[in-house]
Amino acid sequence: MVGSIFGWLGLLFAGMPVGFSLIFVALAFLILTNSTGINFAAQQMLGGIDNFTLLAVPFFVLTGHLMNSAGITERIFNFAKSLVGHITGSLGHVNIMASLLFSGMSGSALADAGGLGQLEIKSMRDAKYHDDFAGGLTAASCIIGPLVPPSVPLVIYGVVSNTSIGALFLAGAIPGLLCCIALMVMSYFICKKRGYMTLPKASRREQFKSLKEAFLSLLTPVIIIGGIFSGKFTPTEAAAVSSLYALFLGTVVYNTLTLQGFIEILKETVNTTAVVALMVMGVTVFGWIVAREQLPQMLADYFLTISDNPLVLLLLINLLLLFLGTFIESLALLLLLVPFLVPVASAVGIDPVHFGVMAILNLMIGILTPPMGMALYVVSRVGDIPFHTLTRGVLPLLVPLFIVLALVAVFPQFTLLLPELFLGYGQ
């Protein structure tokens, strides 16, 4: 089994896609050990994606792409500018606020970086902001998306760990807001030190105009969250409704979405969904082998020999995820490793909802750290900024995010307050 894990890492570093590498290693293990046949492996893989809740993933991805292509991102950016553009930090705060608002529609960090990134960086460049700060802040602010509902990573975590997605959505809201506030504080000090310009304060008329233009877009998270918690529809149905609503805005209300553009959006959605589905298939069969070999129990026993103190275990798990997140794609870690860490956390009384939000925040910090740093690569491409410049700009912004991660890990009330208040979770 250890050889299989090292084999998988070897294939991963050689450039093989995560899903293919997992399937290849799993099939090789089954053949070499004369275990159950290939037919069983195929059944496991198909069973892994035969899940109604996972249908939320392509619909949320589709919603994000529709919002990007329908001109909605510019409306959100202008609304954020009218609210906080006059505060010291100006376009830095606008960048963060726009990411927070957009996160309620897409739920994906990379969709945020790719959709808002170009607009945010151009605006900051025009205002004489340096590329390292503009690009670094754009990358850092995009991690708010996977925490604030709706969130694709939270849906995936809920499926693989059998945890309530509704509770996870509520649990991620406060940590997402904390990340927003922490980044704004750091942005304030950096902008003040560098002497960046501050926009004039928008008048009430201008604020109302920008709100009017963005209002229907801002209703998207209200429809999603309100529908779920009023019992009108499930998270999967909410994702489908949000896609239809985004399509309605782009074609009927704003009339900015063309047929050719819609076809391209569908292609991008299929490509993204196929990558996720392939990973889920690979993780399902590989996870079955890992479970059969009792690796999760061995891992739990090992951690418990070090300490049975929840805070010590959370520290060790966070360090492990931060280390692995620097060179392994975050979605792969979420699918492969996190489900096996949940029993370790549960063994010492750590709530799975609290653990899930903490783990996803940790993994999102991982997409900001080189050499993997997927958000850095996306921002580098859309903003035409050298990778080393982005790395220099994002490093000081990791400090407030680490502080938020520590607060979330130590104080579960940040994650469990809203689920307990609105859902009676844990009672």
Curated annotation (Swiss-Prot):
GO terms for cellular component: plasma membrane. Its main location: membrane. One of its GO terms (molecular function) is transmembrane transporter activity. Disruption phenotype: Deletion mutant is unable to grow on N-acetylneuraminic acid (Neu5Ac) as the sole carbon source. It is found in: Cell inner membrane. The keyword Disulfide bond does not apply. It is a multi-pass membrane protein. Keywords: Cell inner membrane, Cell membrane, Membrane, Sugar transport, Transmembrane, Transmembrane helix, Transport. The chain crosses the membrane at residues 11-31, 52-72, 82-102, 140-160, 165-185, 214-234, 246-266, 270-290, 301-321, 322-342, 348-368, 394-414. Part of the tripartite ATP-independent periplasmic (TRAP) transport system SiaPQM that catalyzes unidirectional Na(+)-dependent sialic acid uptake. The complex comprises the extracytoplasmic solute receptor protein SiaP, and the two transmembrane proteins SiaQ and SiaM. SiaQ and SiaM form a tight 1:1 complex. Belongs to the TRAP transporter large permease family. This is Sialic acid TRAP transporter large permease protein SiaM. It comes from Vibrio cholerae serotype O1 (strain ATCC 39315 / El Tor Inaba N16961). The lineage of its organism: Bacteria, Pseudomonadati, Pseudomonadota, Gammaproteobacteria, Vibrionales. The gene is siaM.
